[in-house]
Regions:
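Intrinsically disordered, low-complexity segments enriched in serine/proline and basic residues
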Residues: 2-4, 8-9
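Compositional signal for N-terminal targeting/processing segments
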Residues: 11-448
Length: 448
């Protein structure tokens, strides 16, 4: 197995396609086991494919307790948010050490930790939130292989590829104290439950394991943090227009995961099949919006589009495309108007309604958010995955209907003029350039 962190490499290559057959269920258990009653399952956040791995692990075991790396102050509102799914929400908490900052837990069905809690509630499994309350939360982001690889290889080589890239926590840092605290809580839970599954970030997994095996002393809670259960955490509705900035997957793909759950259909390959459904839906909306009876986006063109997306994705060293890659290909194949239609479709999440009362709405951005009262705060995601970056793609959007009417109203056909001799020279020059180009192409073909 090879993995490179250069330029965000996320691909795993294996030389033996039958590697999965070499792995047994017992070996998997031993790999994740820490004690006779404790299993640690590291999670790559913001990935629908990895969330499915969490679901498979929970349903294949006989666990009587699920422990998650979240503070107790988040437990009640997180469970409330999960019960409101498929509507997307977020549990937010003010930081005592930084009044302008808010840390939050996205109630995203494509988050592995949310999937685990959801299955625990469904299967009546006890759920324990064991992270330490802190006055200031520090966000940890990394670069990981594409979790789509888990459909072909077991989790062990996948995690082994990530392990060399993980950095050890700084001594006496908040992160080190949190890890030691969680290891201490796991030892306490072992006295109460027979079979525990612990979900934590893949970036904390090796160090929690070390702290547990070395029996690191339990640190004292932060003096600046609120006692017992920490500062209050509240549940907020997320603005439908800003879901893309909060969800780990494309909103339309997340919708397909929830629709598959509702319809009891398979969702194992939605990370790829969902792209095809997104493309077909974007084309349908594009045809309806522009009232087109005949267009060039036939199945052959869409097949060429998918090949183009595949090539761009592999050039980015990924297995699954992101929205930027899909939009670039849509612009090249279908034009700006089709690319705009695809972006608008990708941002759509039909389950997100705004008619329920009881909790406020927050708008998300890149690291910033606008609260219900208009206050702009800095946001810290407790379930952060890979780093997000801005990338610019110029698109010409369709003019507004009002502007179209104004242009039509003020158009003066008698205000335009054309001089025939000049037009003939321009057209003849264009014809001359085309003929010369054809001649050069013909000569090149003759030489070859």
């Amino acid at each position: 197995v090879t993995f490179s962190s250069e330029k965000g490499t996320r691909c795993i290559r294996t030389g033996n396609s039958g590697y999965r057959d070499m792995d047994s269920s017992r070996q998997q258990r031993d790999f994740y086991r820490l004690g006779h009653s404790l299993t640690v399952f590291p999670v790559v956040h913001e990935s629908g494919d990895y969330a499915l791995s969490v679901r498979r692990e929970m349903l294949s075991g006989h666990y009587d307790c699920l422990a998650v790396a979240l503070p107790p102050s988040f437990q009640e509102p997180v469970i409330q948010g999960i019960e409101r799914l498929p509507e997307i929400s977020a549990v937010m908490q003010r930081e005592q050490g930084d009044p302008d900052a808010v840390n939050y837990v996205p109630i995203d069905p494509c988050q592995g930790m949310i999937m685990g809690i959801r299955i625990a509630l469904q299967e009546n499994i006890a759920c324990e939130f064991i992270d330490m309350e802190v006055d200031v939360y520090e966000v940890y982001e990394g670069t990981f292989p594409d979790p789509y690889a888990l459909k072909r290889i077991p989790g062990e080589p996948f995690l082994a590829a990530i392990l060399p890239t993980l950095s050890r926590p700084e001594p006496e840092s908040r992160r080190e104290r949190r890890i030691a605290y969680m290891a201490c809580r796991l030892r306490e839970l072992e006295e109460e439950y027979k079979d525990i599954l612990f979900l934590c970030s893949v970036m904390d997994w090796p160090w929690v394991r070390d702290a547990y095996l070395l029996q690191t002393p339990c640190p004292e809670p932060s003096l600046q943090a609120a006692p017992a259960h920490g500062p209050s955490a509240r549940l907020f509705r997320v603005s439908a227009a800003t879901l893309y900035f909060m969800l780990g997957e494309i909103p339309f793909i997340t919708y397909l995961y929830e629709k598959s759950r509702e319809d009891l259909t398979s969702d194992e390959n939605l990370s790829i099949d969902g792209v095809k459904e997104l493309l077909i839906e974007a084309r349908r909306r594009w045809v309806v919006k522009h009232n087109i009876t005949q267009h060039h986006l036939n199945p052959q063109v869409l097949q060429a589009y998918m090949k183009y997306v595949r090539n761009l994705t592999l050039m980015d060293r990924r297995f699954t495309p992101d929205l930027y890659t899909l939009t670039v290909a849509a612009k090249q194949v279908g034009g700006d108007s089709f690319a705009v239609s695809l972006v608008e479709t990708a941002k759509d999440f039909p389950y997100q309604t705004q008619d329920q009362e009881g909790y406020d709405t927050v708008a998300f951005g890149m690291g910033r958010g606008e609260m219900a009262d208009g206050e702009v705060v800095s946001l810290k995601n407790r379930l952060a995955g890979e780093r997000k970056v801005w990338r610019t793609l110029p698109l010409r959007s369709e003019p507004e209907v009002r502007k179209q009417k104004l242009w039509k109203y003020f158009w003066d056909p008698y205000g335009q003029c054309s001089w025939t001799p000049e037009d003939r020279k321009i057209e003849s020059f264009n014809l001359h350039v085309r003929e010369q180009a054809r001649a050069l192409i013909g000569e090149d073909l003759a030489r070859s």
